Amino acid sequence: MKFALAGNPNSGKTTLFNALTGSTAHVGNWPGVTVDKKEGVYKKLSEKIYIVDLPGIYSLSPYSPEEVVSRNFLLNEKPDLIINIIDATNLERNLYLTTQLLELDTPIVIALNMIDSV
């Protein structure tokens, strides 16, 4: 199975990726840290789950090379599940992408992040 971590820039995707895979991918408190997809494996179940950390996007209409990477993965590689990481401090901006992801007919889980800052 393959799960994709998708969300706006600087929403906590790579932090969740590191927690799930045991990786040490670079994180930063600014957008644009992840510029290409990263892949890791969640091994705590009998079945391996491949986790893909995608660069941050605001919509499925890309404006930068990083956004093209994310959009192409979501549309062409068809993950089994999308985990949409949402920054709770800016729900309106984040939910625009969520509405687009829901239209892909891929199962989606919403992970509300940064709730302690609200």
Predicted regions and their residues:
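Conserved G1/Walker A P-loop phosphate-binding module
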Residues: M1-P65, L75-E77, L81, E103
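Conserved C-terminal guanine-recognition region of P-loop GTPase G domains, centered on the G4
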Residues: G40-S46, V69-V118
